[in-house]
Design a protein with these regions (language model features):
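Flexible "arm" and connector segments at domain edges
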Residues: 1-64, 68-108
Length: 108
């Protein structure tokens, strides 16, 4: 699946199951909530915080998919072709950061 197809799948899902998109501000709040859930898992599973018993069954992939779903919703409702935007951003980052990380002593 590419990003364009993912955007279409989300749009179809919203039309068939979600009635309509939440407004952009609501979706931004939803995105913040979902990113917080990802952060909680990472902080407790891979960071220094102790993992609570109730967090041990949390699925990081599922939470990342929640983040992606809301990002795709925001792109759809603001008429952004995320496939195109991502490709442009990757090109910018490649030109800008071509040697940057290779010369970073902290990464060696």
């Amino acid at each position: 699946m590419n990003i364009e197809n993912a955007q279409k799948q989300v749009d179809d899902w919203i039309k068939n199951h979600g009635v309509r998109y939440f407004n952009e501000l609501t979706n931004m709040a939803q995105l913040t909530e979902e990113v917080g859930e990802v952060a909680r898992i990472i902080a407790r599973r891979y960071g220094e915080q102790s993992e609570k018993e109730s967090d041990k069954n949390k699925d990081l992939g599922e939470e990342l998919a929640d983040v992606l779903f809301v990002v795709l919703c925001l792109a759809n409702q603001t008429d952004i072709d995320l496939q195109d935007a991502f490709e442009k951003k990757l090109e910018i980052k490649t030109k800008r950061d071509h040697d940057r990380h290779h010369n970073n002593k902290k990464l060696k």
